[in-house]
From Swiss-Prot:
This is Iristatin. Induction: Up-regulated following blood feeding. Its main location: secreted. It comes from the Eukaryota. It is found in: Secreted. Belongs to the cystatin family. Residues 32-116 form the Cystatin domain.
């Protein structure tokens, strides 16, 4: 066997094995599993500090998962202010409509899901500053 073929087999083996290791972030299509958007809304609904209105999900941009004490899901999303008032309304993805012509933020939430306990925990939530932009048909 030539050196090139042997090297190629080693590289392919490492790639195949590393994708199965716990702790490695794996990409998923955002529309494959409806739970991804549920977890995005769960993360968004917890953000009430220094806000008068809840934000709501505009677009779920990307999803990655990592197996560590359950499964961590890294959700990258575009969010903007909704019509629901904090302290008056309860957050609901069905009732909290996106306000018109409001700036949006790019946010990343890490949600931990423990399927054996049916438990979801928000581990982190970070956003960019609010910016105005053209609302695309995503």
């Amino acid at each position: 066997m030539s050196i090139v073929k042997a090297a190629l087999l080693v590289v392919l083996g490492v790639v195949c094995v590393s994708s199965a290791f716990p702790g490695v972030w794996r990409k998923h299509h955002p529309d494959v599993d409806p739970r991804y958007k549920e977890w995005a809304h769960f993360a968004i609904s917890s953000q009430v500090e220094n806000r008068t209105n809840f934000d709501t999900l505009m677009t779920l941009i990307s999803v990655e998962s990592q197996v560590i004490a359950g499964v961590d899901y890294k959700l990258k999303m575009k969010v903007a202010e909704s019509t629901c008032v904090i302290g008056v309304d309860s957050y609901s993805k069905e009732r909290c409509y996106l306000k018109v012509n409001v700036p949006y933020m790019l946010c990343t939430a890490v949600v931990n899901y423990m399927p054996w306990e049916h438990k979801t925990i928000l581990k982190s939530y970070d956003c960019s500053d609010r910016v105005y932009g053209v609302k695309s048909a995503e």
